[in-house]
Amino acid sequence: MILNKTTNERFDVKITKADTFFKRLIGLMGRKDIDFAMLFTNIKNHSIHTHFMRFDIDVYFLDKNNKVIEKTTLKPWKFYRPSKKAEYILETKKDKLKIKIGDCLEFI
């Protein structure tokens, strides 16, 4: 579950952590659809891509306090480099969550 502490809104979505090199490498590639959000931790390279993906995603870049510092929507086969360094990256299916830049999140 995700709690948007800024708006007090709760999103009933399962969080899958990509906290190892292999999980970060595979990410959402090859999936036909998802019903969860993927949280990337231990980030070394802030660039992301949507190669081998079959659907659009919303990507949220979070600082060390889980505050959204940047957001983008990507179609399959795209590459993106954020303008700010993030501590965490949250990926979800496009339009699944109503989260804006500046919102603070808590993962429950």
Predicted regions and their residues:
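Compact, glycine-rich, soluble single-domain proteins
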Residues: M1-I108
